[in-house]
Amino acid sequence: MKTSFFCGVSILALTACATQPQSPPLPRAQPSTTQELAAAIDADARRSDHEADAKVRAELAAEAGRDADTCLAREPQAAACLYGGAIALGLEARAHPARAGESLNSMLDKLARAESSDPNYDEAGPARVRALVLIRAPGWPLGPGDTEAGLDAARRAVALRPLYPPNLLALAEGLAKTGDRSGARDAYARARDAAQALPDAADRNDWLREADQGLKH
């Protein structure tokens, strides 16, 4: 799983983005290996990020949840399964806001376990995603949000993968939220430079857009 929680975490409905409604999910071959299950969860998350139809998002969340349960039943300590389970819980939180608090707490638990298992998974994904959840979620008593803890997690991600743009974007967001505008601008600039050094791709363009937006504020 590469970048679905990557730069956006829109699957948390904390910064939900939507394009035009799309058709319901098409039938797909049942994934069987850990790698296939992780890839299937990633595909559901990517689609959910750009899906306006709440019913389709709920179907994608349910599908991702089933794949995550299968993966965890087979390899309960594997970083891919723990991380995939966390992503699936993010989809669940978006699809069912009334249960979001419980889903996000479980998500953070799985991310912590994934980070302990393999902190480098998905370009330091466990720390990066943890950072975004903590930075964007409401704080107690409404949710598990904790900006300072999120900033610490973002710094861990950057320390592991300093040239991966989403890690720098998460750091910039945390710095901005804590009032460090100078530090945030520096991180956004570093994210832009890192993205510009990559081959042209949709993810790269999204990262450049987010960095440029951050530099304008």
Please name every model-derived segment.
Residues 15-34:
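Bacterial Sec signal peptide processing site at the extreme N-terminus
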Residues 22-27, 177, 185-217:
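Terminal, low-structured helical/coil segments at or just beyond the last alpha-helical repeat
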Residues 54-69, 100-109, 143-151:
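Helix-turn-helix repeat elements of alpha-solenoid scaffolds
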Residues 76, 119-121, 162:
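Short coil turns that delineate tetratricopeptide repeat
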Residues 81, 124-126, 167, 201:
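TPR alpha-solenoid repeat register
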Residues 108-109, 115, 145-149, 181-198:
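TPR/TPR-like (Sel1-like) alpha-helical repeat modules
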